[in-house]
Regions:
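Tryptophan-anchored aromatic micro-motifs
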Residues: 2-24
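Contiguous, well-ordered beta-strand patches that form the walls/edges
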Residues: 43-78
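Short beta-strand segments that buttress and anchor functional surface loops
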Residues: 15-21, 37-41, 63-68, 87-90
Length: 108
């Protein structure tokens, strides 16, 4: 289990896999305002650094949002204590992608 508190800086430097079935994006928190997103969607590979907003709600619970270079806008509620992530995305083509999955710290 990741050791976190409600300060966004507690996630800085940490990497997490968000498991949504076969779709498993990897997120690395570079700062409270910068995030590295790595994912494979079909034949498309994403590896980009994006501007993000990270807010602590309570110890172990965070809300994070970012816009990917392709135009997808993503909001996540990350519950690190219970290892659950809720993902809400407005895709660039207008579709909405809402899913719940597991979040797991990755040792790098």
């Amino acid at each position: 289990m990741a050791t976190t508190n409600d300060a966004p800086t507690s996630l800085v430097g940490k990497t997490f896999d968000c498991s949504f079935g076969q779709f498993v994006p990897r997120l690395t928190v570079l700062s409270p305002t910068e995030l590295r997103v790595q994912a494979t969607i079909g034949a498309t590979e994403i590896d980009e650094v994006v501007q993000s907003n990270l807010t602590g709600v309570r110890p172990g619970l965070f809300i994070m949002n970012w816009t990917e270079q392709g135009g997808n806008f993503v909001v996540q509620v990350q519950d690190h204590d219970n290892k659950v992530v809720h993902n809400y995305a407005r895709l660039a083509d207008g579709q909405v992608f809402c899913v719940q999955g597991a979040i797991q710290a990755v040792q790098t």
